[in-house]
Amino acid sequence: MNLLPCNPHGNGLLYAGFNQDHGCFACGMENGFRVYNTDPLKEKEKQEFLEGGVGHVEMLFRCNYLALVGGGKKPKYPPNKVMIWDDLKKKTVIEIEFSTEVKAVKLRRDRIVVVLDSMIKVFTFTHNPHQLHVFETCYNPKGLCVLCPNSNNSLLAFPGTHTGHVQLVDLASTEKPPVDIPAHEGVLSCIALNLQGTRIATASEKGTLIRIFDTSSGHLIQELRRGSQAANIYCINSNQDASLICVSSDHGTVHIFAAEDPKRNKQSSLASASFLPKYFSSKWSFSKFQVPSGSPCICAFGTEPNAVIAICADGSYYKFLFNPKGECIRDVYAQFLEMTDDKL
């Protein structure tokens, strides 16, 4: 969740994002960065810079390396540089410079993937990074890109050169032709891989439909309806076994869908009437909850299989529990930016 160029809440938060298994989340601040354990909530690291802000933080699971990009009113680093921070040494150990602004960074143990506004560059994760690949994209100001964290799957997904298309590339064998998925007619707003890299979920700027595709064939598996009104989708994430997905939007709602068992999702009683528009046969979320503040948020599943966590731009942390019927209760609320080690 990128809150640049400005966060209306005035709390100094510029960016929030989960690590690869959603066990931690990192925050870029006007004065440094922070790392938290997701569930239970605990501040793990707080690095303050007197001289500047961090607009993007990318973790590599729980290891000591993080990718940082400068941001905010006074960026700590130039926005056209990726800095690899070693948290054991408390300093940057790798620096990669580009001719244009960096939109996002993705990491896996052997690769650094840098997203520019119409191009993606892949480097070795070594002390002197070597450029391996360059992929063209359509104009991509949100820096959409996902890299499968699974050690047996080197899949990289990003917007194709055609509007609404997703390109899937296997970084382990780039001689294979990429899989091109015409996911939506409109501009993409969100893409997400499951942890195994076998499924990709997509949403367009319209934000009413979530589509799930098989990554090896590119075939559509499911179409899920978030709502009837347009919305800006901030986040899509799946649980460990990819049976559920959660989706957050600017309507202040987090929806939970069954990704593998569509019968669990709600459907109109008019769904079987063939003469009615497709809308009536839509599969809706079986559970949803409202973030009380209505603030932009990212979401992920917690340590319990029936828990969903929401991390909000106003500094709020929510943990909701849902049951098989879709009933939802709030279990935990906290202000994560105000936490210190002595409070925990």
UniProtKB/Swiss-Prot annotation:
<dbReference type="InterPro" id="IPR015943">
    <property type="entry name" value="WD40/YVTN_repeat-like_dom_sf"/>
</dbReference>
<comment type="subunit">
    <text>Interacts with the TSC1-TSC2 complex; stimulated upon starvation. Interacts with RB1CC1.</text>
</comment>
<dbReference type="GO" id="GO:0005764">
    <property type="term" value="C:lysosome"/>
</dbReference>
<dbReference type="InterPro" id="IPR036322">
    <property type="entry name" value="WD40_repeat_dom_sf"/>
</dbReference>
<keyword id="KW-0446">Lipid-binding</keyword>
<feature type="repeat" description="WD 1">
    <location>
        <begin position="183"/>
        <end position="223"/>
    </location>
</feature>
<comment type="function">
    <text>Component of the autophagy machinery that controls the major intracellular degradation process by which cytoplasmic materials are packaged into autophagosomes and delivered to lysosomes for degradation. Binds phosphatidylinositol 3-phosphate (PtdIns3P), and other phosphoinositides including PtdIns(3,5)P2, forming on membranes of the endoplasmic reticulum upon activation of the upstream ULK1 and PI3 kinases and is recruited at phagophore assembly sites where it regulates the elongation of nascent phagophores downstream of WIPI2.</text>
</comment>
<dbReference type="Pfam" id="PF21032">
    <property type="entry name" value="PROPPIN"/>
</dbReference>
<keyword id="KW-0458">Lysosome</keyword>
<dbReference type="GO" id="GO:0032266">
    <property type="term" value="F:phosphatidylinositol-3-phosphate binding"/>
</dbReference>
<dbReference type="GO" id="GO:0000045">
    <property type="term" value="P:autophagosome assembly"/>
</dbReference>
<dbReference type="InterPro" id="IPR048720">
    <property type="entry name" value="PROPPIN"/>
</dbReference>
<protein>
    <recommendedName>
        <fullName>WD repeat domain phosphoinositide-interacting protein 3</fullName>
    </recommendedName>
</protein>
<keyword id="KW-0677">Repeat</keyword>
<comment type="similarity">
    <text>Belongs to the WD repeat PROPPIN family.</text>
</comment>
<keyword id="KW-0072">Autophagy</keyword>
<dbReference type="GO" id="GO:0080025">
    <property type="term" value="F:phosphatidylinositol-3,5-bisphosphate binding"/>
</dbReference>
<feature type="repeat" description="WD 2">
    <location>
        <begin position="228"/>
        <end position="267"/>
    </location>
</feature>
<dbReference type="InterPro" id="IPR001680">
    <property type="entry name" value="WD40_rpt"/>
</dbReference>
<feature type="short sequence motif" description="L/FRRG motif">
    <location>
        <begin position="224"/>
        <end position="227"/>
    </location>
</feature>
<dbReference type="GO" id="GO:0009267">
    <property type="term" value="P:cellular response to starvation"/>
</dbReference>
<dbReference type="GO" id="GO:0000407">
    <property type="term" value="C:phagophore assembly site"/>
</dbReference>
<keyword id="KW-0853">WD repeat</keyword>
